[in-house]
Structure formats: C-alpha cells, structure tokens
Amino acid sequence: MKMAGWKKKLCPGHHLWALGCYMLLAVVSLRLSLRFKCDVDSLDLESRDFQSQHCRDMLYNSLKLPAKRSINCSGITRGDQEAVVQALLDNLEVKKKRPPLTDTYYLNITRDCERFKAQRKFIQFPLSKEELDFPIAYSMVVHEKIENFERLLRAVYAPQNIYCVHVDVKSPETFKEAVKAIISCFPNVFMASKLVPVVYASWSRVQADLNCMEDLLQSSVSWKYLLNTCGTDFPIKTNAEMVLALKMLKGKNSMESEVPSESKKNRWKYRYEVTDTLYPTSKIKDPPPDNLPMFTGNAYFVASRAFVQHVLDNPKSQILVEWVKDTYSPDEHLWATLQRAPWMPGSVPSHPKYHISDMTAIARLVKWQYHEGDVSMGAPYAPCSGIHRRAICIYGAGDLYWILQNHHLLANKFDPRVDDNVLQCLEEYLRHKAIYGTEL
C-alpha cells in the first residue's frame, strides 16, 4: 500500500505522465541494479558486470592513484614538454614537497589491515583469468625508506603472486618492524626465513636473493617466473603486461649478459674480503671452474622457475656459486655467467651472437650517466632529467615518456625525495592501464 501511494504521488493520474514516470522508475531501478551488481569487493572475473564500462569506472574510482599535485600526468606520459617543464618547476618548490610516510605511520595504520589496504588502495583480486593462471614470484631486497617499499609492493601486488621480502639485518629496528607490519596484512607476502647483513658489492647481496629463492620454491604457489627488486625499483608495466611478456619468453630467461671488459675481469682476479666494507687482497684466485667463460651483467634478472631450481640444486651451479663468493660485486657476473651455461634451463649459448645488453633484456631499465647524450648523434638515450647517484640516473618527470617507450618490466632508480612527481604519474598511469587496459 505504501509503495502504491508513493507511485501515485510521484506519477499523477495522467496517462502520458504515468508512462513517463514508469520509464523514469525503470531507469532508476536499472541504475540501482547496476550499482548492486558492481560491488567491487566481490566482482566475478568471468561476469559481464566486471567487463562493463560502468563497473570499470566504479572500480577505477575506488582504486585510482591520482597525483596529489596540480601536474598533468597524461601530458607527461605522452612527452608533452609544457607538462614536463611545469612538473619539473613544481618539484623545485620545497614548500610543496610532502614529507615521506614514516615507520610509525605504517605501524599504526596496519593495526587494522582492511583499513590499511583500502586506504592505500591495494588491488585485492586478480584482474583477469590469464593473470590468475600465471602467478609471478618476487624477491624484494630492502634496507631503508619504508614508504618506497610500500609503494613498490602496492605497484607490483596481485593476490595470486607470491612475494619474499629480505630486510638487511643492519636496518633500524623500527624499519624492520614496519616491514613486518605491512607484510602481515597479506597472506602471499612474507619475510625471508634467513636474513643477512648486506654489504655493498659483496656476496651478501646475492645471498639475500638465494635465501628468498629457497623460500619461494617451498611455497605452495606454482609461480612461473622470478623477478628480483630493490628499494629504488618501480614497475613500468602492469601485471597483465608482465604476464604477457613472460609468456612470450617461452621458458627462456632474460637478463644482461655480455663479454667483460679488462677492468671488470679484475673483479674476479683477486680475492676480496668483507669487514664493514669490501676490500681487495693480494691473493690471486684460481681460474673459473672448468674454465667456464665469464660474462657480466647486473644484479637483476627475469628467471624461470627451472632456472632458479638449478641455481640451488645443480652441482655445477653450486661450484660456480662457491667460486664467486670472494669476488667483487658477484651479483653482476654470477647471473650473467649462469645465463650462458649450457646446463642451465632457459639459458642461451656463449657465442657472441647471443650477447644481451641491459637495453635488450627486459629485466631492468637503467640510464647510465656515461651513455647519456644526443640521441640524434647515436647516444642510446637523452640526459637524465633528475640527478645522478653512482653514475645512475635518479629519474625525473622528463624521463617518464622515454621510460614508457621501452619493453622492460621495471626501471631503476626512483626516489620520491628527488622527484615524487615522476613516481606519482607512473602510479597513476599504471593503475589506469591496469583497470582500463589503455594509457592515460
């Protein structure tokens, strides 16, 4: 009776008016129905509702990561110079810079995990069946800057993936506790079972990844590939794009592997020892085991599960692992050499035709200061728009268009204290592309 009375009030007893009112009621009912069907907390991947534009819009609005400043991220990602200059000028204004989130902030907000994940806008369900069926493993080695770690985790997070986090034993206790608090909110993120003190350019950097490899192989997740990261990395592809790129490898690995220069050969000519730092001795090392040809690359790799298994279990691999332990920066020649070893799954021959530069491999995009220059004159890339640290570009907003033109899965280095605009725009770009499948 109440419903009938409500209809009479809304729709007076005129036939034409009544027809219009019933049409209005139908539209309202449809919109309410769509709203209920688009419950973003319980979307079914196979449902038509999930694929509808209306639901995508609702989902994006609940998860979008817009830049917090008045910068034109769409223009920056497209290389619009006016937008880039505005962002670079904006970054110079100290008063506009937000202080980084602290260990204490994360210790407090993670007391309520659901609030933390909602407020920090983590994607908590697979965005496609293809992604669900192709889980990726991550080895994440960190030692400082808790907000950097949390934003990196958020950017690469998907509930079907598996994440091992190694924290440097030397890190402050509050940092370690904040990392533990964050990962306690996710069933598929865990701390490495064995932690080591990481010394720059020493074996410990490799050991951190090996510890995560062991743990990841013991997990119940049937991951296909392993990616390793550090705290200054950030993805430049969505999880869906990564899955597609990894499938195209067809079991092969992707990492830099080139012939070493004479200066780099000195890295394994003498033995190195570790105290608080790494220092050379006068002790000459024996040649590589079985006169294996040595190659150089970097610390980062895209490795198949079978490759990882052989790193840990194959006797020939273990002999090489032992041999490189007292060399300088072994992470930059161990993986590169194993990638050319004939017994390793997914490797490539040692013949020069198979040399792989960092620009050819998909593991990591880096701008080296000594390679920057005029592209029209043959330089591989333009000068860094941020600053340099250890001859590596800390990206600025002017680098983002170039970054997004490359095929790599991740890029290095980012630091929000140097330029947060480039990171915010990259976050906005990736989140938009993850939900809509299109660029900003």
From Swiss-Prot:
It is an enzyme of class 2 (transferase). Residues 31-440 are lumenal. Its EC number is 2.4.1.102, 2.4.1.148, 2.4.1.150. Non-essential glycosyltransferase that can synthesize all known mucin beta 6 N-acetylglucosaminides. Mediates core 2 and core 4 O-glycan branching, 2 important steps in mucin-type biosynthesis. Has also I-branching enzyme activity by converting linear into branched poly-N-acetyllactosaminoglycans. Contributes to the post-translational modifications of structural proteins. Pfam families: Branch. The chain crosses the membrane at residues 10-30. It catalyses: a 3-O-[beta-D-galactosyl-(1->3)-N-acetyl-alpha-D-galactosaminyl]-L-seryl-[protein] + UDP-N-acetyl-alpha-D-glucosamine = 3-O-{beta-D-galactosyl-(1->3)-[N-acetyl-beta-D-glucosaminyl-(1->6)]-N-acetyl-alpha-D-galactosaminyl}-L-seryl-[protein] + UDP + H(+); a 3-O-[beta-D-galactosyl-(1->3)-N-acetyl-alpha-D-galactosaminyl]-L-threonyl-[protein] + UDP-N-acetyl-alpha-D-glucosamine = a 3-O-{beta-D-galactosyl-(1->3)-[N-acetyl-beta-D-glucosaminyl-(1->6)]-N-acetyl-alpha-D-galactosaminyl}-L-threonyl-[protein] + UDP + H(+); a beta-D-Gal-(1->4)-beta-D-GlcNAc-(1->3)-beta-D-Gal-(1->4)-beta-D-GlcNAc derivative + UDP-N-acetyl-alpha-D-glucosamine = a beta-D-Gal-(1->4)-beta-D-GlcNAc-(1->3)-[beta-D-GlcNAc-(1->6)]-beta-D-Gal-(1->4)-N-acetyl-beta-D-glucosaminyl derivative + UDP + H(+); 3-O-[N-acetyl-beta-D-glucosaminyl-(1->3)-N-acetyl-alpha-D-galactosaminyl]-L-seryl-[protein] + UDP-N-acetyl-alpha-D-glucosamine = 3-O-[N-acetyl-beta-D-glucosaminyl-(1->3)-[N-acetyl-beta-D-glucosaminyl-(1->6)]-N-acetyl-alpha-D-galactosaminyl]-L-seryl-[protein] + UDP + H(+). The gene is Bo17. Was acquired from an ancestor of the African buffalo around 1.5 million years ago. Coiled coil: none annotated. This is Beta-1,3-galactosyl-O-glycosyl-glycoprotein beta-1,6-N-acetylglucosaminyltransferase.
